[in-house]
Amino acid sequence: MNINFTLISQAIAFSLFILFTARFVWPYLLRAIEERQQKIADGLAAGERGKKELELASQRSSEVLKEAKQRASEIVIQAEKRASDIIEEAKQNARIEGEKIIAGAKAEIQHETFSARESLRQQVAGLAVQGASKILRREVNAKVHADLLASIEAELK
């Protein structure tokens, strides 16, 4: 065999191989490469979107946290105000109840004082009758001297 013939036959075989590859294999390879490039581009775009969404979610969570802290602060302030109002109301109720108790106690003291005075008047009248009976050495009839005792009681009042 001649080297020229071998070289030419190899060149023809190589040309046929290139032609076959370019016509039948190359489009599938290009399509696979393009699909892979598209998947990579989609993945990168999804990564960027995810990064932006993460940033937005971080901002939203920061805002929600800030709002929650503000709301919690408002709730604490309202609770403190309500507690203060309850304490003031309890103090006012205690004052009113204390005044009622004092007024009741004063009325009871006044009633007891009046009862004690009446009892003392009756005892004084009895002692006066006994004293008069001892002085006169005879017993004084209470029915006869009822007017006298009533006038003594009136003077003691």
From Swiss-Prot:
The chain crosses the membrane at residues 7-29. It is a single-pass membrane protein. SUPFAM superfamilies: F1F0 ATP synthase subunit B, membrane domain (SSF81573). Its main location: membrane. One of its GO terms (molecular function) is proton-transporting ATPase activity, rotational mechanism. Pfam families: ATP-synt_B. It is found in: Cell inner membrane. CDD domains: ATP-synt_Fo_b. Keywords: ATP synthesis, Cell inner membrane, Cell membrane, CF(0), Hydrogen ion transport, Ion transport, Membrane, Transmembrane, Transmembrane helix, Transport. One of its GO terms (cellular component) is plasma membrane. Gene3D superfamilies: 6.10.250.1580. Belongs to the ATPase B chain family. F(1)F(0) ATP synthase produces ATP from ADP in the presence of a proton or sodium gradient. F-type ATPases consist of two structural domains, F(1) containing the extramembraneous catalytic core and F(0) containing the membrane proton channel, linked together by a central stalk and a peripheral stalk. During catalysis, ATP synthesis in the catalytic domain of F(1) is coupled via a rotary mechanism of the central stalk subunits to proton translocation. F-type ATPases have 2 components, F(1) - the catalytic core - and F(0) - the membrane proton channel. F(1) has five subunits: alpha(3), beta(3), gamma(1), delta(1), epsilon(1). F(0) has three main subunits: a(1), b(2) and c(10-14). The alpha and beta chains form an alternating ring which encloses part of the gamma chain. F(1) is attached to F(0) by a central stalk formed by the gamma and epsilon chains, while a peripheral stalk is formed by the delta and b chains. This is ATP synthase subunit b. It comes from Nitrosomonas europaea (strain ATCC 19718 / CIP 103999 / KCTC 2705 / NBRC 14298). The gene is atpF.
